[in-house]
Amino acid sequence: MTLEPAGEPAAWHAAPDEAAALAALIDAAAAADGVAPISGHVRDAVRSGAAQVLIDPGASPDDPAGVAVALAQDPAEVTVAPDRRRQGRGRSLVRAAVERQGAVWAYGDLPAAQALASALNLRPTRVLLQMRRPLPIEPLGYQPPAGVRIRTFQPGRDEDAFLRVNARAFASHPEQGRLDRSGLGEEMAQDWFDPNGFFLAVTDPGDELLAFHWTKVHPAEPAGQNPTGALGEIYVLGVDPAAGIRGLGSVLAERGLQYLAQRGLDTALLYVESDNAPAVRLYERLGFTVFQRNVVYRPTNQG
């Protein structure tokens, strides 16, 4: 096979009509690297046309060599087809992505990504840990404090209270803290959404929301070079900083993990910022260990 040399990528544009070809590219990269280079919600945004893409077309628009994806103000996400690498394509795409978005994700922080970041004078500014543990979880004995009960989320009733507490709990978080009613509605419309796995700690009496644990089930992916079974996730675990009650996170975490085990899942995962020491300690107490590091890189001269 003769590999065409890297050229200049086309202009940034929305590409819902090219989503299938880009999905094939992303899947091939994930199979080769053992880690998905583009996150699920960004792939959804490519399909819907909400994201902007910069495509290295390679020899044919139907068989792209690489892509950079920009969504809102978030760090860009970039990948190159496994058989088109070491030709300067990644360098061109990452340079353009950082110029547009100011930063780029490196999922898995693989050695090739580290080397490219160093060559482009990019430095790590954020580390998002993926942690995992086996299920079921042994009973830990966490009980709701006096005056608190646990119930599940009720669509049509709890959205506004959840958004208020979520905004306070994640006020400094670059993604979760800006979730609004529209974004929540989009999440609730997804096939994976299940209110039976969305747990709320509320006052009793009063039913005032204090904390929440939203779980998620990822379906099995048996095909490809890196097949996986279904996975359960601590999707979002948040406590209202104004609640003033200790132990709510532990109670809700255990309840959610028990639910995921009852669904027949044998592995739970979560994502947590590496510098969120209290959360990391909680998850370590629950038996989670680091499975993967995801890093945001920015130019060395950028704050």
UniProtKB/Swiss-Prot annotation:
<dbReference type="GO" id="GO:0008999">
    <property type="term" value="F:protein-N-terminal-alanine acetyltransferase activity"/>
</dbReference>
<feature type="binding site">
    <location>
        <begin position="244"/>
        <end position="250"/>
    </location>
    <ligand>
        <name>acetyl-CoA 2</name>
    </ligand>
</feature>
<comment type="subunit">
    <text>Monomer.</text>
</comment>
<feature type="binding site">
    <location>
        <begin position="78"/>
        <end position="80"/>
    </location>
    <ligand>
        <name>acetyl-CoA 1</name>
    </ligand>
</feature>
<keyword id="KW-0808">Transferase</keyword>
<dbReference type="InterPro" id="IPR050276">
    <property type="entry name" value="MshD_Acetyltransferase"/>
</dbReference>
<feature type="binding site">
    <location>
        <begin position="276"/>
        <end position="281"/>
    </location>
    <ligand>
        <name>acetyl-CoA 2</name>
    </ligand>
</feature>
<protein>
    <recommendedName>
        <fullName>Mycothiol acetyltransferase</fullName>
        <ecNumber>2.3.1.189</ecNumber>
    </recommendedName>
</protein>
<feature type="binding site">
    <location>
        <position position="175"/>
    </location>
    <ligand>
        <name>1D-myo-inositol 2-(L-cysteinylamino)-2-deoxy-alpha-D-glucopyranoside</name>
    </ligand>
</feature>
<keyword id="KW-0677">Repeat</keyword>
<feature type="domain" description="N-acetyltransferase">
    <location>
        <begin position="148"/>
        <end position="303"/>
    </location>
</feature>
<feature type="binding site">
    <location>
        <position position="271"/>
    </location>
    <ligand>
        <name>1D-myo-inositol 2-(L-cysteinylamino)-2-deoxy-alpha-D-glucopyranoside</name>
    </ligand>
</feature>
<dbReference type="GO" id="GO:0010125">
    <property type="term" value="P:mycothiol biosynthetic process"/>
</dbReference>
<comment type="similarity">
    <text>Belongs to the acetyltransferase family. MshD subfamily.</text>
</comment>
<feature type="binding site">
    <location>
        <position position="216"/>
    </location>
    <ligand>
        <name>1D-myo-inositol 2-(L-cysteinylamino)-2-deoxy-alpha-D-glucopyranoside</name>
    </ligand>
</feature>
<feature type="binding site">
    <location>
        <position position="233"/>
    </location>
    <ligand>
        <name>1D-myo-inositol 2-(L-cysteinylamino)-2-deoxy-alpha-D-glucopyranoside</name>
    </ligand>
</feature>
<dbReference type="GO" id="GO:0035447">
    <property type="term" value="F:mycothiol synthase activity"/>
</dbReference>
<feature type="binding site">
    <location>
        <begin position="237"/>
        <end position="239"/>
    </location>
    <ligand>
        <name>acetyl-CoA 2</name>
    </ligand>
</feature>
<dbReference type="InterPro" id="IPR000182">
    <property type="entry name" value="GNAT_dom"/>
</dbReference>
<dbReference type="Pfam" id="PF00583">
    <property type="entry name" value="Acetyltransf_1"/>
</dbReference>
<dbReference type="InterPro" id="IPR017813">
    <property type="entry name" value="Mycothiol_AcTrfase"/>
</dbReference>
<dbReference type="InterPro" id="IPR016181">
    <property type="entry name" value="Acyl_CoA_acyltransferase"/>
</dbReference>
<keyword id="KW-0012">Acyltransferase</keyword>
<comment type="function">
    <text>Catalyzes the transfer of acetyl from acetyl-CoA to desacetylmycothiol (Cys-GlcN-Ins) to form mycothiol.</text>
</comment>
